[in-house]
Structure formats: C-alpha cells, structure tokens
Amino acid sequence: MDLTGLLITIVVAFLITVLLSPIFIPFLRRLNFGQSIREEGPQSHQKKTGTPTMGGLMIIFSIIITSLIMASRTDEGINYQVWLLIFVLFGYGLLGFLDDFIKVAMKRNLGLTSKQKLFGQIIIALVFYFILRNQGFSTVIYVPGTELQFDIGWFYAVLVIFMMVGASNAVNLTDGLDGLLAGTAAIAFGAFAIIAWYGIPDHVVAVFSLAVVGALLGFLVFNAHPAKVFMGDTGSLALGGAIAAISILLKLEILLIIIGGVFVIETLSVIIQVISFKTTGKRVFKMSPLHHHYELLGWSEWRVVTTFWLVGLLFAMLGVYIEVGM
C-alpha cells in the first residue's frame, strides 16, 4: 500500500460515518436515546439535554469495516493485530454501550457501577495480553528517544491492564464538550499512524489508526458545536482502549503519555481536584475535568475546544519527533 491507499483509508472511513449519520441520528432520537446532563455541570450545558447519544456505534462500525477492507490491501494482510484491535475496540465499545443503554433506556443516571465497569475493562485487557503473549509478544519496554530498554517480565501484564483501563477512563473524561474528544483523539491516532507508517513500520496498525482518524473526522461533522449527536461512553471507552492497544502493539507504551498528553492532563486535573478537596476542603479548579474549569472562567465552548485541539497537536508533534525525527 502506498500513500494513496492511506488517503483512501481516511476517505472511506469518513464517508461511511457521514453517510450513516443522517440515518442513525434520527433513529436514536426516535428511540429517545438522549443524553442526560449533570445538574452540577455548567448551566450552559443544560440545553444539550436530550441530544442523541451512543453515536460511538457509527464510529466503531466505520472503523471495523474500513480496517478490514484496507488492511487486506497491505503486504501483511488481515493479521492477528487487526483482529486484536477490533476485539479491543468492540469490547470496550460494548462496555460503553451497556453503560449508555442503562442510562438512557433504563433511566439509571449512573449507568454501570464503577466496579462493574472496572471488571469489564480488566477482563478485556487480560484477554488482549494473553493473546499477545501467545503470539510471542515481547515484554520489553523501550524509553523513547534513547537506547534504553527493560524487560519487565510478568509485570508487563500489570502494565497492559493499567494502560488500557487508564487510557479508556482518561479518554472518557475528555468527552465533555462538543467536538473535544473527536478532535483530540483524531490528532492522537494520526500521530500513531505516522509513526506506524514511517517509524516502526507496521502498515496494518497505520491503516487501523487512519480508519479511526477518518471515522472521527466524519463524526465531527455532526459533533462539532452545536452537536447534533454525542458519541457517549460507547465511543469514548472504545477509543481509549484502542489507543492503548495501538501503543502496546507498536511498543510505544511510554510515548502514549506524550501523544495522549491532553487525556493525561484532563485526568490529572480530576485527581488533583479530588485529593485537594478531601485533604483541605478546597478546590484547585472551578470544576474538573480541566475543560470545564475554562468554561467557568468565561471561555466559550468553541474556544476551549480549539485550544485543547492545538495543545493536542503540539503533544502529537512532539511524540512523532521523538520517535521518528530523532
């Protein structure tokens, strides 16, 4: 596959999502699968109540179809990596779907309990790990930009679980404003696609990553402010699990912290807020995750989103430079 094939991958995923949306969004609306907005959230968000959610189903469908079509055109073909990535995407997407369904259809605001969600996340991560090890996958981790490497043996299983659970939750936390996650995730997956194509190389993972980029760009047409649909936990958990799986397959476990810098910052803002409030009774931020803090400072939603996109782009460029440029 050449660069034309990579461009076609993005276009195919984009078109599938764009063409599905005018059919699927009204379908979600007829089912009354509307987003409920937290009362303690910014007041400007209350008008979003009832906006169709679970749009992540379109993203997942587009990624799977595009990946299978385009991966078959690579020299590697549809190998175990493709099926592993699809498994993770579908598995975490299913977990998110159950969470969303309980919220919107069964009218339980909290969805799955934290223990139920964590259990599902760990099980999927463990299956992913054992399949990797069965394929003879190395337990060595590499320090980006250096010659340093460490074989961590059985502890690699713990690392995989931590990464997949952590990434899925971090990405989920970032999904709080119109277009915020779709844009930052598209940038992050794009960075991994560049590294997979030019740096590693691993063309199958590059194709999957670009399928995600195309699907997210198509979703942005309907998710940018004012959003006509939300991806819900169905999409955010799937994307978080997938980006962790990609970084593991490419042996870029540490680099995920940089390329996914926006997700890391959003998560840290929540952790800092909770620790500060529990220990001192005071809040560091007006509200967490961090994007809500800037909203309450008076920033428009679009300004917050575009600023986070730019920050995400800087993190992505730094990650690509460390792995490919150096």
Curated annotation (Swiss-Prot):
A Pfam entry, by short name: Glycos_transf_4
Family of this protein: Belongs to the glycosyltransferase 4 family. MraY subfamily.
Subcellular location: Cell membrane
Cited InterPro entries: Glycosyl_transferase_4, PNAcMuramoyl-5peptid_Trfase, PNAcMuramoyl-5peptid_Trfase_CS
Keyword Cell cycle belongs to the record: yes
Protein name per UniProt: Phospho-N-acetylmuramoyl-pentapeptide-transferase
Cofactor entry: Mg(2+)
EC number from the UniProt entry: 2.7.8.13
GO annotation terms (biological process): cell division; cell wall organization; peptidoglycan biosynthetic process; regulation of cell shape
Reaction catalysis annotation: UDP-N-acetyl-alpha-D-muramoyl-L-alanyl-gamma-D-glutamyl-meso-2,6-diaminopimeloyl-D-alanyl-D-alanine + di-trans,octa-cis-undecaprenyl phosphate = di-trans,octa-cis-undecaprenyl diphospho-N-acetyl-alpha-D-muramoyl-L-alanyl-D-glutamyl-meso-2,6-diaminopimeloyl-D-alanyl-D-alanine + UMP
Biochemical pathway: Cell wall biogenesis; peptidoglycan biosynthesis
Keywords: Cell cycle, Cell division, Cell membrane, Cell shape, Cell wall biogenesis/degradation, Magnesium, Membrane, Metal-binding, Peptidoglycan synthesis, Transferase, Transmembrane, Transmembrane helix
Phylogenetic lineage: Bacteria, Bacillati, Bacillota, Bacilli, Bacillales
Parts of the chain that traverse the membrane: 5-25, 51-71, 82-102, 122-142, 148-168, 180-200, 204-224, 229-249, 252-272, 304-324
GO cellular component terms, semicolon-separated: plasma membrane
Membrane topology: Multi-pass membrane protein
